[in-house]
């Protein structure tokens, strides 16, 4: 029996996007992720804070994922996943990301034990920056 997980495993998050060129520019220039590799006009891999982000355009079912279709988010008011980026200074991160073009839902909000705010990528994937209070 093999071991799972193994020490050299890595988790990659797949995000379905409508326009790969627009998304590559946003993840590189706004979020500050490092572009690792592009695969034509259908996908791109980024390294960000020790994690992998794979951006893909939509896709039909395949033999290894029958009955599963990849599609970009449709309704920005309904979220089935989000990303939390823990930072030392939420307000500073907010300022930097706004300068780069990130569009926030609100300025940082102080909950007492946490300061946080949310922004979206061009396809409405939700990101949170959070500072422990």
Predicted regions and their residues:
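Vicinal oxygen chelate
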Residues: 1-12, 34-85, 92-120, 131-133
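Conserved beta-strand-loop-alpha-helix junction that forms the acyl-donor binding cleft
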Residues: 14-19
């Amino acid at each position: 029996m093999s071991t799972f997980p193994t020490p050299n495993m890595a988790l990659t998050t797949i995000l379905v996007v409508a326009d790969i060129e627009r998304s590559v520019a946003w993840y590189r220039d706004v979020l500050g992720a490092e572009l690792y590799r592009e695969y034509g006009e259908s996908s791109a891999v980024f390294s960000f804070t020790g994690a992998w982000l794979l951006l893909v355009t939509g896709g039909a079912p395949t033999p290894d994922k029958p009955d599963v279709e990849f599609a970009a988010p449709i309704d920005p008011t309904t979220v089935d996943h989000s990303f939390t980026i823990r930072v030392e200074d939420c307000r500073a991160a907010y300022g930097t990301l706004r300068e780069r073009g990130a569009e926030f839902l609100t300025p940082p909000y102080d909950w007492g034990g946490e300061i946080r705010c949310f922004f979206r990528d061009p396809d409405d994937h939700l990101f949170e920056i959070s500072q422990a209070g």
